[in-house]
Amino acid sequence: MKYCKKSFFLVALLFTSLPSFPADFGIVKGSDNQVIELVRMNNLLPEYTRQAVRYGIEGSVKVQFNVDTFGAVLDPFVVESNPPGLFERASIKAVRKLIYQPPVFEDQAVNVESVQVDIVFKLQ
């Protein structure tokens, strides 16, 4: 019986602690700072760390990366993290799995630079 209670608690916790992604924009490489919107083909969410769940910690991470002409994420890195040291690894891992619709500008497939996503970790 104890096992069932723990399983239910874990499932309930997973549904109440999902991070969220806002819309994504980036700069067309080689353009005069032309900004375009990127369309996600998937929306993989990072895992909320056990330590953060255990202690009720919420936070956010800003990740920057480039997107190639096929829609793949390149070179993600953390720009800002609050609190530092807790959510960065999960955020980078999730961002690497994102796939975008191949970006097009003026009927040409383009590379997009300086895409930033803010990932918010919030317990509900």
Regions found by a protein language model. Name each.
Residues 67-68, 73, 104:
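Short, acidic, Ser/Thr-enriched surface-loop or helix-capping motifs
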Residues 80-86:
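A short acidic/small-residue loop/turn micro-motif
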Residues 29-64, 91-124:
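Short proline/glycine- and basic residue-enriched helix-capping loop/turn segments at helix->loop/beta transitions
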Residues 23-24:
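Boundary of Sec targeting at the N-terminus
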Residues 1-9:
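Bacterial N-terminal signal peptides that target proteins for export
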Residues 16-20:
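N-terminal signal peptide c-region/cleavage motif recognized by signal peptidases
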